[in-house]
């Protein structure tokens, strides 16, 4: 459906891919309608809890399952009829290339099933793309080990008598860049990128290879991101659709809108029982 406004509420939720937060999904025991990837191993429509969906592998990530459960809880709180809710997994052919899993929450109303929420596991695509183009590693996070680890690592030590005359005023930048190499090149010469993007070529005579012992307390990693996106206007439209009704009582037509007091625009209203001059 097309509405006059298109307001979105989005969250970028960053997690450690090796240690994702895992919530107790048994807090949401009720079953909901799940529609897995039609091209996957379990096509069809199923009634299951979020815990069952995760344990069966239909939902691929615990944090995604948690957001699905929280979405259902929120929609019920604001007045959505749970019998008119389903969660549909994107088919492989429609999923964005950077996502490893993506689910839409759809609500049934006057215009059929309409997407109102999208929850995507965007993995590390965004931050790695930013790092690639900005040449900055500032968006990495630090993971502390439970116990410090002894580690042997190969390093390249600059030969000052060669680096200095070759690169002159930039010799310090070259030496610093060499000390920060994450992977040691397998052959010479190799290209080395400086902080400003300049590429220099390092020959075998410019460095000495050495093995150093160190005690490491942790490591930097690129966080993954789970992104829930809520279509505010579509949700409001379906709140009205699910809670508006007209009933006949004793020959009269009554129009009723039942809203959760938490979201109702007014706590109460006082109205006259009949129309009469001077009573309004």
Per-region residue spans from a language model:
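NTP/phosphate- and nucleic-acid-binding module
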Residues: 1-280
